[in-house]
Amino acid sequence: MTDENYPEHHLDYRPPLSAIDLGKVVYNGTYAEIYNYARDEYMRSIGYPYSKFLNEDKKNFAVIEMNVKFRKPLHYDEETVIVSKVEKIGTKSIVFDQKIYKENMQVLCNEAKFVMVCIGLSFKSEKIPEVLKNAFKNGPVK
């Protein structure tokens, strides 16, 4: 895997009512969905939407490891920012580092690390396309 300094992606996010549990905070199981949404937006921002990866490249990223740390609760409609960053890209795998902040990026609420493997239609690991690796290196399309 290569360690490089990949650009961060920032996404403004307000938890919807559907994400809230009986304790009036974001349900713990929902964080995986929130982070998945942020990764989709990250890929869209670099000019390589996940839909292209799925439909044209016929590839997918399968989560093989997920580590989540819960620090502060998130509430319905609260203004937050999700920061997503590629930590490492290998031949067939990628590591995403993601964090959720509130109060103008002053309070870290949640952080997660996802290790994902590129797979094809046969569900066997495949190489990550070089064009996608380069898109992550180059960052958001202006």
Question: What residues fall within each predicted segment?
Answer:
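Catalytic strand-loop segment that frames the active site of acyl-thioester-processing enzymes
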Residues: M1-S45
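HotDog/MaoC-like acyl-thioester-processing domains
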Residues: T2-D3, L11, F70, L74-Y76, ...
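Residue-level signal for pocket-adjacent positions within structured domains
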Residues: P15-L17, Y48, E56, F123
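Residues that recognize and position ribonucleotide moieties
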Residues: K24-V25, F61, V107, E126
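Residue-level recognition of specific faces of alpha-helices
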Residues: E33-I34, A62, V115
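Hydrophobic beta-strand-centered segment that forms part of the acyl-chain substrate-binding groove
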Residues: M43-I89, S93-I94, N110-E111
